[in-house]
Each structure stands twice: as C-alpha cells, then as structure tokens.
Swiss-Prot record:
GO cellular component: cytoplasm
Protein name: Elongation factor P
Location in the cell: Cytoplasm
Organism listed in the record: Acidothermus cellulolyticus (strain ATCC 43068 / DSM 8971 / 11B)
Domain of life of the native organism: Bacteria
C-alpha cells in the first residue's frame, strides 16, 4: 500500500483488480481547496491510456511486477516459448501478449518479460535490433538522389521501409518500437 504522494513514473498500480502503469503524474496544490494528483495511466494489457485524478494522500495498491530477462526459444502454435535465463523455466506466452514484438523476435534472442503473480503481462525488446533483409527490389539507377524508400522483408517476415541503396542480404538496424529503419548494422 502506498499513497498518491509516492507515485513515480513507471510504477504499476492495481486499481479495481486491473493493472495500470503510471505514464506521468503531477502533484497539484491549488490556491483554494485540497491538493490532488493528476495522473496519466496506461492499462498494462490493452494499452489504453486514461487520465485519472486522485486526492492527495489517498492509498493505492502497488502491484509487484517482476521483469525478467528471458530467451525466446521457438513458436508453438499460437504461443511463443520463452526460457528464464536464471531458472531455466519455460513460459508459453500467447501471441496477443507478445504483440508487435513478434515482428522482431528471432530464435535465441533475449527479451524482458514482465510477470505479475507468474502471469506474463508484456514483452519488451531492446530499442533496436539487427536483422537481415531477405528480400527487397533492386534500387533503380536514377532514383538514388531522391532519398526515397522501398519495401523490404526481414528475416522474421516483417515488412519495413528501407532506403533505395539497401540490397537483399544486408543486415540493418530496426527500431522495435516504431518498426523504422535506423541504418546499416555494424558488422
């Protein structure tokens, strides 16, 4: 149990049996009336963002979320199998929990899995990953100066936009949050 005065960004709260991450908060002390805390909360499972105001000093439940480094092993039907790198326990995580991270997951890649009471909540990948281009159209000779882009398929099957000079077989850096091309990988 904590009070609204103890809130910090990134904290996970248990409100009415649902888990919410504190995205931002602001303690407000108006000239007239009691102080209050204005927060922006993000639902852990759905990603829905809401604004919620608490009176200052109100008790809130803080959920314990355990973030563990795990290794992605393989995909089995509708779930992804991860192994805890410390205990070697295997977790079958549903595809909807993995979400967009599935587009950038390679076998044996490490990711951070957030667990609440043994239940996986979400999967966090590093900000950027290096992946190989498996297919892209060759760049047209006259198009190089325009700075245009073309679609490319990654080894995970995901499609991204890359500059015209990138060819099949090259390793590129991709932002896992936006799916954007960041540059060639340093090999």
């Amino acid at each position: 149990m904590a009070t609204t005065n103890d809130l910090k960004n990134g904290m996970t709260l248990d409100l009415d049996g649902e888990l919410w991450n504190v995205v931002e908060f602001q303690h407000v002390k108006p000239g007239k009336g009691p102080a209050f805390v204005r927060t922006k909360l993000k639902h852990v499972l759905t990603g829905k963002v809401v604004d919620k105001t608490f009176n200052a000093g109100v008790k809130v439940d803080v959920a314990t979320v355990d973030k563990r480094t795990m290794q992605y092993l393989y995909r089995e039907g509708d779930s992804f199998v991860f192994m805890d790198t410390e205990t070697y326990d295997q977790y079958h995580i549903p595809a909807q929990t993995v979400g967009d991270a599935a587009n950038f997951l390679l076998e044996n890649a490490e990711a951070v899995v957030a667990l609440h009471e043994g239940t996986p909540l979400y999967v966090e990948l590093p900000a950027a990953v290096e992946l190989t281009i498996t297919y892209t159209e060759p760049g047209v000779q006259g198009d190089r100066s325009t700075g245009g882009t073309k679609p490319a398929t990654l080894e995970t099957g995901a499609q991204i936009q890359v500059p015209l000079f990138i060819t099949t077989g090259e390793k590129v850096k991709v932002d896992t949050r936006t799916g954007e091309y960041l540059g060639r990988a340093n090999s």
